[in-house]
Amino acid sequence: KKIFVAVVQLALRERYQNVKIGILPTYFSFGKAQEKLFSASGIRCKDLRPVGSLRNSIYLDNCQDPLSRYEKNNSLVFISQWKRGLCLNPTNNLYRAWNQGHRRTFQAVYHYAISHSIKLHVILRNTFDHVDNMKHQEKYFMDAVESSEINFLSSKDNELASYPPAYSAEIAVHFLSTLGFEVFGHGRKVLCCIGLGGGKEFVEEFGVQELIEELPKELLLFDDDEGRIDEMITDLRKMSNHDYQSLTKKARNYYMSAEEGKNTHERIQEDISKILYSKKYA
């Protein structure tokens, strides 16, 4: 009996290493970047379908006021990527570099918000494999800036709760976050600061070239220089929405290839139904 297998991408991943499966079945990816990442990892996919983000699509479809996500809000958000193994006593040089880059990005954004009198929200990462993870995550950020006056946003009770603040912020800043790319794909102003992990050398060792190479230079801090974050955020804030949409159109489609006029979750459902019918699985 034939069994149909499909994989749906839910998060960004660096290059795959020591992969035991060389060929993937039908794969619903965020965008075209995944094809290059698979190729660089020595993985072949029989049927790769760039469709955008499933979770983001579900959120937007259920949003009571979809237009609200385009309203300008005078606030910044920092998207946390706190992970226990990376941020709590990292065990190797790569993890330590990642941790420092993530921490320095937050510190720079925090100080920008203070100096420009702008609200800053920190969207916490859901991580519950240890009961004290969220406590350690909050402490990580408070220790980084020696302050407990931080507005943390947690989506513990609602998997989609991280989307509204990311959409409503004037600028979203991240180190290399799935959520950051999701809202970028739908036109929000987003700054990626992966370079603070150690510049080009870190990016190559971490294996994320394919995830950043199509980002416009105005949206990517590739150099190991947190001093540039202040200027880059200011420039993005000053950029008109029309200019921003024109600048990012190609990259948005490259990373989040949602078909215009069709929700990603509906597209996946339709594609699977057609495949099952044509292959006589059903």
Provide a role label for each language-model segment:
Residues 24, 45, 50, 146-147, ...:
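Catalytic binding pocket for nucleotide-activated donors in carbohydrate/polymer assembly enzymes
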Residues 56-142:
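Conserved catalytic-core segment of nucleotide-activated headgroup transferases in glycan assembly
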Residues 10-13, 33-35, 54-56, 81-85, ...:
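Short, solvent-exposed loop/turn segments at secondary-structure junctions
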Residues 127-186:
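Donor nucleotide-activated moiety binding/catalytic core segment of transferases
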Residues 2-5, 120, 152, 190:
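Hydrophobic beta-strand scaffold residues
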Residues 26, 75, 170-171:
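Structural motif
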